[in-house]
Amino acid sequence: MAERRIPLKHEYAQDGKVIYGVDEAGRGPLAGPVYAACVVLDPADVIEGLADSKQLSEKKRISLADQIKQRARAWAIASASVEEIDRLNILQASLLAMQRAVVSLRPISNALVLVDGNHAPRLDCEVQTVIRGDSLVAEISAASILAKTARDIEMLRLHEAYPVYGFDRHKGYPTKAHLEAIRLHGITDIHRRSFAPCVGQSVSGARTTSFINQKEA
């Protein structure tokens, strides 16, 4: 299958606007932070193969993430913690992560921030939401790839701390294996206690000694 670049919608490319694409990763999992990314692509340096991160293999996502970081005009990745998710709710925490990613790039005066979905963070610049933006707008697609790969790396790191939960396989999503691990071991301090399967569960001490020593070093 031929690779393709997702074309910008015509109206978004007008008026000399600089497009900042924004997307998040990790709203559905029971554990771990939620991530967001913001990307400004170079129109003169087309990155082939961009698509919704969920439609790409892990190998392809990693390859594209490296290209985006090397060839984009600007990019940023941010997150909101499990504590923020439980305190604010997952939607507001996702918007907070998006806001952090965009603000860290200090958008210029003619910036147009395009956000995947139908909710946008509060920003001091022009913002539009785009339903299915990760499949329609190259900048949003690139942001979805950076957010997803960054979160996956974090969940692999957390797997070292809590290997019995299998975060290396499901990345915190509510798979059958993950739910069974919660039933057997309880939850950890990186589980989202406001999410239904985790509500009322006891906190486990199932953390590896090597990870504790690493954190304390």
Curated annotation (Swiss-Prot):
Cofactor: record remark: Manganese or magnesium. Binds 1 divalent metal ion per monomer in the absence of substrate. May bind a second metal ion after substrate binding.
Disulfide bonds: none
Reactions mediated catalytically: Endonucleolytic cleavage to 5'-phosphomonoester
EC annotation from Swiss-Prot or TrEMBL: 3.1.26.4
InterPro entries for this protein: RNase_HII, RNase_HII/HIII, RNase_HII/HIII_dom, RNaseH-like_sf, RNaseH_sf
Keyword Nuclease set for record: yes
Subcellular location: Cytoplasm
RNase H type-2 domain span: 17-207
Alphabetical keyword list: Cytoplasm, Endonuclease, Hydrolase, Manganese, Metal-binding, Nuclease
Main location: cytoplasm
Entry annotated with the keyword Manganese: yes
Cellular component, GO annotation: cytoplasm; ribonuclease H2 complex
Top EC class of this enzyme: hydrolase
Pfam family, one: RNase_HII
Residues annotated to bind a divalent metal cation: 23-24, 116
Top-rank taxon: Bacteria
Entries under PROSITE patterns matching the protein: RNASE_H_2
Residue ranges that the Swiss-Prot or TrEMBL entry lists as coiled coil: none
Biological processes annotated in GO: DNA replication, removal of RNA primer; mismatch repair
Required cofactor(s): Mn(2+); Mg(2+)
GO MF annotations in UniProt: manganese ion binding; RNA binding; RNA-DNA hybrid ribonuclease activity
Recorded family membership: Belongs to the RNase HII family.
Function: Endonuclease that specifically degrades the RNA of RNA-DNA hybrids.
The name this protein goes by in its record: Ribonuclease HII
Source organism per UniProt: Nitrosomonas europaea (strain ATCC 19718 / CIP 103999 / KCTC 2705 / NBRC 14298)
